[in-house]
Design a protein with these regions (language model features):
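Conserved Walker A/P-loop ATP-binding site and its immediately adjacent core
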Residues: 1-21
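Extracytoplasmic/secreted cell-surface and envelope-processing proteins
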Residues: 12, 100-101
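Amphipathic alpha-helical
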Residues: 16-28, 219
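Conserved RecA-like helicase motor-core motifs
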Residues: 26-36
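Conserved P-loop NTPase catalytic core
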Residues: 36-41, 49-54, 59-64, 68-81, ...
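Walker B catalytic acidic pair
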Residues: 94-98
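Short, conserved "post-DEAD/DEAH" coupling segment immediately C-terminal to helicase motif II
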Residues: 102-122
Length: 219
């Protein structure tokens, strides 16, 4: 399942990211798929339905046994009760730090958390990534969810208060333009230019770059 800060954002992630990956799978990796090759709402990895014809019934023709994954990838509109009553193997929560009123990420997580469980058994996982809005525009709820996900603070069942584990990745670890050809971040300004993935020189470190940005904003 896919959720984002708005329905159109979830749809865009599905159509622009998920579907092209499926389309470009090598044929020997691609599961059997039902429906269109570029769907707008759901990727259905199941065996397409076949019609029962009079000829098949009269001749008692045996249907070819083909197995599929019997699973789907879809997206939902943003709302507190999105995916209510469903069971999921994976939920991708995109831009979860930017849910503005009247939607509330805390309310939605109380619902979707149950989609990943059967009683006490965990049957699915959630990947919830985001930068954060201002506190009064969804950031406060996301902040609470983040601090409720401290892996060092667990209840008697071994789970955090939220059921998630928090992971903070600082901006400088993955800032475009400051990653060298080996995939490592260039923190400090190098003595001689490093080389980026595209062969372009990196003459400045990301920390110095952002220090200059901050200084430029001072009145």
């Amino acid at each position: 399942g896919i959720l984002s800060k708005s329905g159109p954002d979830a749809k865009k992630m599905f159509t622009d990211k998920v579907v092209p990956i499926s389309v470009n799978y090598p044929f020997f990796f691609k599961p059997i798929q039902d429906g269109m090759d570029r769907p707008k709402t759901e990727l259905a990895y199941r065996v397409p339905a076949s019609k029962f014809t009079r000829k098949k019934l009269d001749t008692n023709e045996k249907l070819q046994e083909i197995t599929g994954l019997d699973t789907t990838i879809d997206w939902k509109n943003t709302g507190d009760n999105s995916y209510d009553g469903e069971k999921l193997k994976l939920l991708v929560h995109d831009e979860s730090g930017k849910w503005e009123r009247p939607t509330n990420i805390l309310n939605n997580w109380r619902v979707t958390k149950t989609c990943l469980r059967l009683g006490s058994k965990i049957i699915g996982k959630c990947m919830m990534g985001s930068t954060s809005n201002a506190l009064d525009k969804g950031g406060e709820n996301f902040k609470k969810l983040y601090y409720d996900s401290d892996a060092t603070k667990r209840n008697a069942n071994g789970q955090t208060r939220s059921g998630l584990y928090s992971l903070f990745i600082p901006m400088e670890w993955n800032y475009e333009g400051y990653i060298d050809s080996f995939g490592f971040p260039v923190f400090e300004t190098p003595k001689k230019p490093a080389e980026g993935p595209d062969g372009s020189p990196i003459r400045q470190g990301v920390i110095e770059y952002w220090t200059n940005e901050v200084e430029g904003l001072k009145g």
